[in-house]
From Swiss-Prot:
Active-site residue list: 235 (proton donor)
Keyword flag Transmembrane helix: no
EC number in record: 1.3.1.9
Residues that hold NAD(+) according to the record: 48-53, 74-75, 111-112, 139-140, 244, 273-275
Residue(s) at site: Plays an important role in discriminating NADH against NADPH: 75
Biological function: Involved in the final reduction of the elongation cycle of fatty acid synthesis (FAS II). Catalyzes the reduction of a carbon-carbon double bond in an enoyl moiety that is covalently linked to an acyl carrier protein (ACP).
Swiss-Prot/TrEMBL keywords: Fatty acid biosynthesis, Fatty acid metabolism, Lipid biosynthesis, Lipid metabolism, NAD, Oxidoreductase
Binding site for substrate: 225
PANTHER family with a match to the protein in the record: ENOYL-[ACYL-CARRIER-PROTEIN] REDUCTASE [NADH] (PTHR37480:SF1)
Protein name: Enoyl-[acyl-carrier-protein] reductase [NADH]
Amino acid sequence: MIIKPRIRGFICTTTHPVGCEANVLEQINFTKAKGKIANGPKKVLVVGSSSGYGLSSRITAAFGSDAATLGVFFEKPSTETKPGTAGWYNSAAFDKFAKAEGLYSKSINCDAFSHEAKQKAIELIKQDLGQVDMVVYSLASPVRKMPDSGELIRSSLKPIGETYTATAVDTNKDLIIEASVEPATEQEIADTVTVMGGEDWELWMQALSEAGVLSDNCKTVAYSYIGTELTWPIYWHGALGKAKMDLDRAAHALNTKLSVTGGSANVAVLKSVVTQASSAIPVMPLYIAMVFKKMRAEGLHEGCIEQISRMFNERLFKADGTAADVDESNRLRLDDWELREEIQQHCRDMWPQVTTENLAELTDYREYKEEFLKLFGFGVEGIDYEADVNPHVEFDVVSI
């Protein structure tokens, strides 16, 4: 079929398999050009490995450290009338390129919150790898099906305490608007912590530990974002922030356990990037368009793969073997460049000035839109989008 982009709300409902493969290859080539990670991991489990930071983590481990990787995700293959999800094609491309280099690659397509996902991962690790020396937890899901009761819990992207009103961009109409978001109820806050907090990360690590599939020096990392006062009302001081604070709680608990055998658990605070997850958060697209323009001008711009490469090389697996630099809460900070005062001051100055008319001039909004489409395999250089492509892509994946 010939596949064109179709946008609905915060997602593109179509995907291009060849474009997705090209995106993955671009990240692989970046990783290879960086050279090998000195003390990198060799057997890695990535929970949430099909897009964004999770995919970049899998690529960095495999192509930067020759690691065997097991990826867990929840994606949809193609049907007779519809292409598969971008994460399906990303994972298929990763599998193809990893196997071509003789690297172990297996994937599990399932609900990562379920007991079954954990048991299947343990089974494959025991069967193929013995143990893993790194676990990356990178789930971004709006819903969690509770593994025991089957109850569906939903997260909320809302402020706490009072209605939040701010200048934002309507990404469908390319208009500057005033966005208002009602505050979360106590129940919505609790539910957001249940879905996006640290509990499931702990359950994964507990299951892996009890099964004896964690090596003595196993490192685990989960991803977070803090930002600044520009986004705090909707993010760090909102319901989502409470969940991310719970991730910190989980990291401390896990670190206490893992450090006994020379392992570690950290939250890595990353910069804002264009992902399917961030595009759904009110105000984030406008902030990202602003901050990207300034960071590009300063030569500090990074996407997912650059961030994760820096985390592996300069934080977790330093060439000199020394411990990672952490903040006062034991977090790895990769948002350091974004948080530089001159970058943030630029955004503070720009925010009141942005209008629909000057949006493209004052910010990198055009580039934001291009990057958003690229997530789904569109607008990638060198791809013929008029060509007939086969949407049915199979690979080494166990579906539960």
